[in-house]
Amino acid sequence: MPGEGEVVGDASDRRVEILCDRDELVVTWTRFGPRRDGASPHIHRAHSDLFFVLGGELTFFVGPEAEKRVLPVGTLAFAPPQLVHGFRNAGDGELRYLNFHAPSAGFADYLRGRNRDFDQWEPPADGGLPMTEAIVAPPGTGGILIDRDEIRIEVRGQDEPRQPSARLTCLYALEDARVLEIQA
């Protein structure tokens, strides 16, 4: 939950909290003020990058042509390794989102200013993976949003039974009485 993580950036137009920092997974909660830039188009070579929109709208740029998609509350966006992606808050309101890096690739230390060798690179000359490799689960999608080797994310009711797993599991309570369950 916001306010319970390690704060690594706190300004009037941006706040970032690390909620989970493990080798398998880093989860951050972020707030951007209106018209705030995030990351310009880039790739990761060794890990996946995911966004779950909690409030406002996230403008997501994806694929070799950096096609723009506006993601409303409740949307999950997934960028596998080698897929060009970037993001910003292009709107007039506040943006809040969860960001997942699986495996972590040292993302938390990068946010702390201690990992200059973080797995983030300029888009490759060949454009990287086609944008069809991105996964965007629209708002209102329930159940399993993504299930890949490196990460599994499910939305379920707070009272629904959880399946035991040997994987690292993080839970995030959503405002609508549902739970986001993340396994890495």
Language-model features: where?
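Short, charged beta-turn/beta-strand-edge "cap" motif at the junction between a beta-strand
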Residues: 83-86
